[in-house]
Amino acid sequence: MRPPGFRNFLLLASSLLFAGLSAVPQSFSPSLRSWPGAACRLSRAESERRCRAPGQPPGAALCHGRGRCDCGVCICHVTEPGMFFGPLCECHEWVCETYDGSTCAGHGKCDCGKCKCDQGWYGDACQYPTNCDLTKKKSNQMCKNSQDIICSNAGTCHCGRCKCDNSDGSGLVYGKFCECDDRECIDDETEEICGGHGKCYCGNCYCKAGWHGDKCEFQCDITPWESKRRCTSPDGKICSNRGTCVCGECTCHDVDPTGDWGDIHGDTCECDERDCRAVYDRYSDDFCSGHGQCNCGRCDCKAGWYGKKCEHPQSCTLSAEESIRKCQGSSDLPCSGRGKCECGKCTCYPPGDRRVYGKTCECDDRRCEDLDGVVCGGHGTCSCGRCVCERGWFGKLCQHPRKCNMTEEQSKNLCESADGILCSGKGSCHCGKCICSAEEWYISGEFCDCDDRDCDKHDGLICTGNGICSCGNCECWDGWNGNACEIWLGSEYP
């Protein structure tokens, strides 16, 4: 059996769906009409009274002048999808500001599009406490973005929460860490967001159909289907999954800023010249080990050379497989990914850099240097990429003194991360500095809060062996560039 009022509930739901987006005041009774389209059971005066704000005299605007009155219910005019105006159409906006996914940050109530904050909180989204019990260090730590920058350099930190710089009143800088800047979407000519042909989200324009460009400034004269067809590569992928399709043309992801066209090219980005480069080729403009021609990612070798990358001379008495095996040593890569293998012998790169050496280039003394270029913190010597510390010092880079001049309490206070946990629970504290667990080689950072597995790899090596992983980002050594320090921008070597 259906519960009492079920039919009336269906009538109400049908009425609301028919009317569009609307709101129902608490005084509304679902039995005011017997069925949709039936005569109203209220008098005209009573219907209009219910559509006026309390205390307003007869003759005052119904539904605040923003809707029509239908049997005591305001049917509000919908100006934009997602914008509502309340039971009596009294609100200009219905949706309130959010912070970290919560309306009014969970510290207030939404009233007509504006947050009414609980006592002890303030801000557009009630996100700022009036009294702060955090230390400045903890507060700043909570305000750092994934690049370890406080409020993305676009705001100030207030008790662990970012207050974005919107002094011009535009409100275009926002986000938990002020990481979004919608000023980037303003078209220079029209001064409109996305040229008036799209929506901006976190500094990026999302264009309406038929428009494209960084700021939706260009109009496309072909259909989306035709655009997709022109961008489809021979293997059936859009721009070979290595580019972006814009109005039927592929813009390939250029990974080599020094190249004339980059390593990826072709009408549908089907050619990847990186497949022609040996590890050591990145030190020069050579493809195919300097002994062949690269044609759309495949090497055509000169006479006297063979191999996938023309790396093996036919004059060598070893087979290509034997040559590579001799050059690998204990590494999975020939010459440890740091040199050129030719007939079973390694030539370490960059040439002339004495910090890279060994039979299979297994020693890399650059690993003993910190980001400032200091070897073993100035308290040790480097031996095959590892620090041998002087007496009284220890650590991967000899950065920790064995003697400490502070109390245990002082030391622990300096080792607490933003959440109050000592070294993020992944290390021990010594003299105010965290020593991350040796068992988990990938844990690093001031508070052991970073995971070096997040750093990009190339040729199977983190940061390609040409930089240091710092909190998930590669810090490249001089002469190197790229997300994984895979691009050589230094001098060309013979």
Curated annotation (Swiss-Prot):
Expression sites (tissue/organ): Widely expressed in many tissues, but readily detectable only in aorta.
Region (Cysteine-rich tandem repeats): 51-494
Glycosylated sites: 405
VII repeats: 327-367
IX repeat spans: 415-454
V repeat feature ranges: 231-275
Domain I-EGF: start-end pairs: 40-90, 91-127, 132-179, 180-217, 220-270, 271-311, 316-362, 363-399, 404-449, 450-486
Annotated Gene3D superfamilies: Laminin
VIII repeats: 368-414
InterPro entries: EGF-like_dom, EGF_extracell, Integrin_bsu
IV repeat spans: 185-230
Any Gene Ontology biological process: cell-cell adhesion
Start-end of each III repeat: 143-184
II repeat feature ranges: 96-142
A GO MF term: integrin binding
Bilayer-spanning residue ranges: none
First and last residues of every I repeat: 51-95
A Pfam family reported for this protein in Swiss-Prot or TrEMBL: EGF_2
Comment text on domains: Contains ten tandem EGF-like repeats strikingly similar to those found in the cysteine rich 'stalk-like' structure of integrin beta-subunits.
Protein name (database record): Integrin beta-like protein 1
